[in-house]
A protein has these predicted regions:
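Phosphate-group recognition and catalysis centered on beta-loop-alpha active-site segments
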Residues: 1-246
């Protein structure tokens, strides 16, 4: 069996506040071989890691990410909503995550959050940052904005891309070919063994999301997924270890 990438969804987000350095570091301790994160642009053009386009769910701030400078965002508490022990956590920058994983072999799945907010120049900034760390071979750029992914592939053919989608896409590997994407980041219920086989024949792979139940993890391992995105990298690591032993 080929090695399956164990992607920690927003870091180890079941154990730590999502998309924080604590979550990213903890995911590596729990056996993750990949980290999934979300990137947006601050008002002054910095690459900040946060899922929501607004601040209120995961910080003590309010309003839109795009309307704040980095200096303002760095003052926010990005951890107390999860647990008081994480009150010192701040919104991280993409370069901080890349520095963390640079010498680890970890694959990083960077989701471009550019559907609700069409951040001008986001693709170029992410690609430039990845290249500055010489990590192109260990990056997958994903998005629900497939125009953006096509642009990424045109700008950086060496960086893998993955189309994010829910379900119901007919022969998604053929669609992925049309936008030159390498991977299918499907909602996990949309992944069946025959789909994985079809994708493999077309040179595409599946990285389903977000898979937290062990039974579903086993199903996707057996189906041939190349990577699995989960809030529980420790659970997945244990199952993958058992699969190798058997």
């Amino acid at each position: 069996m080929d090695s399956i990438i164990n992607f920690a969804h927003r870091g180890a987000s079941a154990a730590c506040p999502e998309n924080t350095m604590a979550a990213f570091a903890r995911s590596l301790e729990l056996g993750a071989t990949g980290i999934e994160t979300d990137v947006q642009l601050t008002r002054d053009g910095r690459l900040v890691l946060i899922h929501d386009e607004t601040l209120s769910r995961t910080t003590n701030g309010s309003g839109w990410v795009k309307d704040h400078d980095l200096e303002e965002l760095r003052k926010l508490d990005a951890g107390s909503w999860f647990h008081p022990d994480f009150a010192e956590e701040r919104l991280p920058l993409l370069e901080e995550l890349l520095e963390l994983v640079q010498d680890t072999g970890t694959v990083v799945n960077i989701e471009l959050k550019n559907t609700k907010v069409p951040y001008a120049g986001l693709e170029e900034k992410v690609i430039d940052m990845v290249r500055s760390y010489n990590l192109s071979e260990r990056i997958v750029i994903s998005s629900f904005n497939h125009y953006s992914l096509r642009l990424c592939k045109q700008l950086a053919p060496e960086i893998r891309t993955g189309i994010l989608y829910m379900e119901g896409l007919y022969e998604p590997w053929e669609y992925a070919r049309s936008v030159e994407a390498d991977a299918l980041h499907a909602y996990h219920f949309a992944v069946l063994p025959e789909f994985v086989a079809g994708a493999k024949a077309a040179g595409k792979v599946y990285h389903p999301w977000t898979v937290n139940e062990e039974e579903e993890m086993r199903r996707l391992i057996d189906a041939g997924a190349a990577g699995i995105i989960t809030d529980y990298p420790d659970k997945l690591a244990a199952l993958l270890s058992a699969s190798v032993r058997s």
